[in-house]
């Protein structure tokens, strides 16, 4: 997908080296088409890596996508320079008067805190409520999925006895769901978290549909409003070395984290990473953009706020 990104965004050069086509805003402005407008609310501390992960997955389609990066106003980043944030990010108040075709809300390393203890919880709730009316389809990732399910549907999260860490096998609960068109019957997804949401709580809420789960890592994808809200507890967007970097970081901090499961060849951290999730991750995001964004969004963005559920069969 030709992505319209701000000139000089670090992800552009990284992805060009991977032979992924992106265009800057100067070239994109010369194309006389209605681009899809996607918001990326980046809650992660190291923002450049997260930007690159998601931009990589939003690429490789004939449609043009304008990506707008948004940060929390009530949080001061310690791991991303102010210069980068000033150059490439907006605050919520800068975009709240517009409608968008799609939105991605990333995870955040806040799992062991109560939601109400998060310094920007009130601001985040306002963004959740805004997205439910002003965005055609929103992906909530990892902690954001837990936060969104709690905010909208009262679903609690539970602490795990140990970190869910590795790449786990998953199956879908509906072969005809457009989000999984072209998927194999079993596929792998990385997880890295200390908390979980539980199947029995999801099944108590009629408006929620459990789409993907794993025998080992539990609930992965839950849908609401026929795909206007999609909650994903795993990290399909992770680059090959992300879990390795997290593992080394934990060891450097003296945290006795177990080796990520199903990740290294022969489960040996001195050997190569076995990349088993990237093909399905790319297909997942292509399907989301096609069936839940491009085919579902009105041509006139003003009509987005009048949508109820999407007309997507699940």
Curated annotation (Swiss-Prot):
Entry's Gene Ontology molecular function annotations: homoserine O-acetyltransferase activity; homoserine O-succinyltransferase activity
Classification via Gene3D superfamilies: 3.40.50.880
Involved pathway(s): Amino-acid biosynthesis; L-methionine biosynthesis via de novo pathway; O-acetyl-L-homoserine from L-homoserine: step 1/1
Catalytic activity, reaction form: L-homoserine + acetyl-CoA = O-acetyl-L-homoserine + CoA
Pfam families linked to this entry: HTS
SUPFAM superfamilies, per the entry: Class I glutamine amidotransferase-like (SSF52317)
GO CC term, one of those recorded: cytoplasm
Record site: Important for acyl-CoA specificity: 111
An individual GO BP term: L-methionine biosynthetic process from homoserine via O-succinyl-L-homoserine and cystathionine
Site (Important for substrate specificity): 192
Active site as annotated: 142, 235, 237
Enzyme class (EC, first level): transferase
Biological role stated in the UniProt entry: Transfers an acetyl group from acetyl-CoA to L-homoserine, forming acetyl-L-homoserine.
Protein's name in the database: Homoserine O-acetyltransferase
Organism of this sequence: Azobacteroides pseudotrichonymphae genomovar. CFP2
Organism lineage: Bacteria, Pseudomonadati, Bacteroidota, Bacteroidia, Bacteroidales
């Amino acid at each position: 997908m030709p992505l319209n990104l701000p000139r000089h965004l670090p992800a552009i050069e990284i992805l060009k080296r991977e032979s992924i086509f992106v265009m800057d805003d100067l070239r994109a402005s010369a194309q006389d088409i209605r681009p899809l407008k996607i918001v990326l609310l980046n809650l992660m501390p190291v923002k450049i890596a997260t930007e690159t992960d998601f931009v990589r997955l939003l690429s490789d389609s004939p449609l043009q996508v304008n990506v707008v990066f948004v940060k929390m106003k009530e949080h001061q980043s310690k791991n991303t320079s102010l210069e980068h944030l000033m150059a490439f990010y907006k605050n919520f108040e800068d975009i709240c008067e517009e409608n968008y075709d799609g939105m991605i809300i990333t995870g955040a390393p806040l799992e062991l805190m109560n939601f109400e203890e998060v310094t920007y919880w009130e601001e985040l709730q306002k963004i959740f409520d805004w997205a439910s009316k002003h965005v055609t389809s929103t992906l909530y990732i990892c902690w954001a999925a837990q936060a969104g399910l709690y905010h909208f549907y009262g679903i609690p999260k539970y602490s795990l006895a140990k970190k869910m860490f590795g790449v786990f096998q998953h199956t879908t609960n509906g072969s005809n769901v457009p989000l999984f068109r072209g998927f194999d019957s079993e596929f792998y997804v990385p997880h890295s978290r200390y908390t979980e949401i539980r199947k029995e709580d999801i099944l108590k809420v009629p408006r929620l549909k459990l789409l993907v789960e794993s025998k080992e890592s539990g609930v992965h994808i839950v849908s609401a409003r026929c795909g206007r809200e999609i909650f994903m507890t795993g990290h399909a967007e992770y680059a090959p070395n992300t879990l390795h970097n997290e593992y080394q970081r934990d060891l450097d901090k003296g945290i006795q984290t177990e080796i990520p499961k199903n990740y290294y060849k022969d489960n040996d951290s001195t050997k190569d990473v076995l990349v088993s999730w990237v093909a399905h991750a790319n297909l997942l995001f292509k399907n989301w953009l096609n069936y839940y964004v491009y085919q579902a969004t009105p041509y006139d963005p003003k009509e987005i706020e009048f949508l109820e559920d999407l007309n997507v069969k699940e």
